[in-house]
Amino acid sequence: SRKVRSINYFSDKLELWHPDKKFNSVLVLGEQGIGDEIMYSSLISDLIDTKIKVGLFMDRRLKGLLSRSLGNHEFIDNQEEAIRKGYSSYIPLASLCKFFRNSKDDFNKNSFYFRSNKSILKKLITNYKSQKPRIGISWHTESLSHGTQRNIKLSKLIHLLRNENIDFINLQYGDHGTEINRLSKKLKRDIFLNDSIDNKNDIDGLCAKISACDVVIS
């Protein structure tokens, strides 16, 4: 995969970052999928706290979200650019766990959280109009290794979705139009509030949608 090739590329050209070594900069390599990069992002804030220059070689869809949440750290577009920029070390993102997550207290000490785009959030809330409680729902992952444990048919949530005192927001990525339309016909109304956000590619928009929710079911 691209992520494995990147790790192999940088391991031949840069030293592996370690807190006991005096590096002046480090390139953080995203690994696995975008969901894992989001899950491990709080580790980057711990790395930044060590006062080292941090560059990010991660999924470009996260640039806006991470720039707002972590500060404007450099996003690197390709391997050669990282070498030209003179980074002195590299580390795969999840490998930061062994330095910054060794006890429950380490999790409690970290105060990192994602910041949604306020402009997008304001437009969404204006567009949604209703004052009903808003519940965001996602129900499917494309993960081959964990999909069977984490997926559910949308129809299994019909007891919840039939409640007309709640507004539902679609947080699901991918093409699930047929499934949504089938259930909408059964309930004789649109299940989800309308918006134009691409949940797979517009991560800033998706983050704003989550922020607009009172509750999220995932």
Go through each PLM region and give its residues.
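Catalytic machinery of carbohydrate-active enzymes
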Residues: S1-S218
